[in-house]
Amino acid sequence: MRRIFLINLFLILISFNKVSSQSAGDTVAYLLTCGPGTETYSIYGHSALRIVIPEKHQDSVYNWGVFDFNTPNFVWKFAKGRLDYMLVAQSLNSFLGVYIYEHRYVYSHKINLDANEVRKLAELINENLKPENRKYRYDFFYDDCSTRIRDLIEKAVGEKLKYPQPEAGKMPTFRDMVAKYQEPFPWLRFGVDLIMGSTADKKAVFRDRMFLPIDLKNELSETLVYRSGKMIPLLQNPEVLVDFGSPVVKQNFFTSPPFVFTLAIILIMIAGSLIKSSKTIRLIDIAIYSVFSILSILMIFFNFFTDHLQMKWNLNIIWLNPFIFMCLIMLILNKSGTIWFRIVFIISAAFLLLQYVLPQDFNIAFSLLTIILLVRSSVRCEYDWNPLTLK
């Protein structure tokens, strides 16, 4: 859904075409849904609006998923949540060309709008195309290429639009929604679960689910619109514009985070019992605590120094707490630091016991990583009852 045009972006874009509202009776609007790819930015798919005006021979696609990769301080702005996306207009052929090249399907659904609604939609798009309006601050859950289309349709159709009644069954969370697209990519899911906070565990009602392109298509397919005294489907006339199946990604359990971290626990425990050199053990612990310290710094950054709402209130900061960094300093200085290791040990044990009652869903790999912290901190706690304590 994040349309990062890594090839020269502006070679495929045309000028910002206005939508003519003078021929609204002949104008047809389509929802374009693009399939997921295998790159990180493309696994969620993409959405765009297509407007066709037959008498003017105009066939344009309006795409809210573009940003300029050459933006100054791009990486920093992206991490801080201050990267602006923009609306661009392009020809249908240039839009489809990207998906043909990437072997990703593109589905089209006609949006059932009357002449007044098409005119209103055209006015809204033209207003959005103005230079002062075409950029917007991207928000993964609440303001992206899909929610922009949803909002325009709602404004154009008004009260004649009817979403299905709230379902009685279990509502998915935002984390659940994105996780289904991450299943073929366990390391990506690990990373996303790591940086997304408890706000991602909010229940996603019907309208909220439209932040994902394929879900936008699915939810609008269940949506009705009032026409001539009866309710009819909002989307109709499904068509395949680019015919590729969903990508097949081979998974290997032996490279997945749970297997890798389980193996790491075993190797660390074996090393701790077999290696007699305290210097070697200290170097191993420095390496381990360095990794956890970096992750702890990331948790602090995403909790307190980013505008990404999805990363706020991230309870992973419990097991990736700043005390880990103090342990690293003690190891580097070759000091005992018993108090710091005891704090990390207690917090790690508490997290493993209480994680299931916390208001955040934790990846199983986090428990395995916490066990590594628990084991290595227990070794340096200097508890008399602990047989692993360094002598």
Residue ranges: model-predicted function:
Residues 2-3, 22, 40-41, 52, ...:
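A general structural signal for short secondary-structure junctions and capping/turn motifs
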Residues 68-159:
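A cross-kingdom signal targeting lumenal/periplasmic-facing segments of multi-pass membrane
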Residues 46, 59, 108-110, 146, ...:
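Extracellular structured ligand-interaction cores
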Residues 6-9, 22-24, 31, 133-135:
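Internal catalytic domains of large membrane-associated glycosyltransferases
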Residues 22-24, 40-42, 248, 303:
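Alpha-helical membrane-anchoring segments
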Residues 25-104:
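Glycine-rich catalytic cores of cysteine/serine-nucleophile enzymes that process amide/ester linkages
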Residues 1-22, 387-391:
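Bacterial Sec-dependent N-terminal signal peptides
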Residues 127-324, 328-329, 335-342, 348-391:
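Activation targets extended, charge/polar-rich intrinsically disordered C-terminal tails
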